[in-house]
Amino acid sequence: MRTLSFNQPRQRSIGMAINNSKVLIGGVAAGVVMNLMDYLSNGVIFAERMRAESNAFKPGLGDMMSQMDGKSIAGLVIMDLVIGGLLVWTYAAMRPRFGPGAKTAIYVALVFWIFGSIIGSGYMQMGMISSGLWLSFGFFYLVALVLASIVGAWLYKEDSATS
C-alpha cells in the first residue's frame, strides 16, 4: 500500500514535450487573427454602439476611448499576441489528453471564452454597457477565439523528437 507523503521527490511522468517553436509560430498567427477580429468588433461592428453606451455611462468616455493613440493600439496588439500564444500553448498542453485537431482547439477557445466573459461581465455589472452589447461582444469574442485557436492549432505540430 502506498502512502501519501509530501517529503518524497516527485516522479516526473513521461509525456510529450511542448514544441515551443511551433507554439510561437501558431501563437503569432492566432494573435493576428485576434487582432483582426478585435479591429472588426471594436473598430467597425460595435464601435458606434459602444461609444454611445460609454458616453451614456459617463459623458465623454466613449469619445475618449474611440480616439486611441499609437501607444494604446500597440498595447492592444501585444495583448492579442499574448492571448494567441496562450491559446496555442494551452492547445499543446491539452493535446495529449484530447487529441490533435479542431475539437481540442474549440475546447481551448471555450475555456478562454468562459474566463473572458466572466471578466468582461464587470462592464455590464457596472452599467458601462448594456446586457445586449455584452452578449453581442461575448458571441463575437467566442467566434474570434475559436477561429484563432483553430488557426494556431493547425500550425502547431509535435516534433518527432519530442513525441
What do these predicted ranges mean?
Residues 2-163:
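Juxtamembrane/disordered regions of integral membrane proteins
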